Amino acid sequence: MLVASYFSYAQIARDNLAKKTDPAAELAQLLDSLSGHSDVIGSQWLATKFGVEEWSLDFYQIIFSIIQRIEGIRGMLASLEGFEHLRSDIEGHLDALKLAFTTTGLQVAWVSYGANHVNRSNIQPLKMCSAFLRAHISYPDLSIEERDQVIYTVNDLLKWLLEHQLEENDFIRQAIIEGLEQFLFRIERLEWLGWGYSL
């Protein structure tokens, strides 16, 4: 079962050698979909955009995932050589983007706060650093069909792991289950494959 799942992903990776993405490109694409001017409060705007209930567990997980991705990109860029001269600029844009997902951003009209941070002037630098980042961290840019195939394979694997976990209660298996559940959440809700090395 595990071997079959791995080879299924390996086949997708081979088929997508020319089509790559990276953490910054995925985040920029998501933020592009959130940019816009709406008079509803930020929490309502985001809940509607993601198709979740406002202040639900899924809502909080989405906000956390976005902030985690912003901080992850900051950490990745800090660890790479040759980016020092641009680091302070991109960090300013990352800080501005993050403000949209703070308490203020969620509790006032999106148009008066969130939209002022999730905008072209902050997203464009993220797209530009994507090219630099992709040389170091990249993974397949999946089509909708390929994403569905990955989701199907991971669900299959989860089912198998959960059946065995009921009998054996192994803490390592539980950690794998929780990791796969988070992976599924991100790929289904945010359409993020994740970091290349996490696969």
What are these model-predicted stretches?
Residues L2-T102:
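Leu/Val/Ala/Ile-rich N-terminal alpha-helices, chiefly Sec-type signal peptides and the beginnings
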Residues Y6-Y9, Y60, Y113, Y139, ...:
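Sequence-level detector for tyrosine residue identity
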Residues H37-A47, Q124-S130, V150-N155:
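Short, compositionally biased low-complexity segments
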Residues W45, W55, W110, W160, ...:
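A residue-identity detector for tryptophan
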Residues R69-S79, A100-T103, Q107, W160-E163, ...:
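Amphipathic alpha-helical interaction surfaces
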Residues L77-R87, L106-A115, D141, L166-R173, ...:
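Charged, low-complexity interaction regions
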Residues E84-E145:
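Internal, Lys/Arg-enriched amphipathic helical interaction segments that engage polyanionic partners
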Residues A131-L199:
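Membrane-active, amphipathic/fusogenic segments and juxtamembrane/transmembrane anchors
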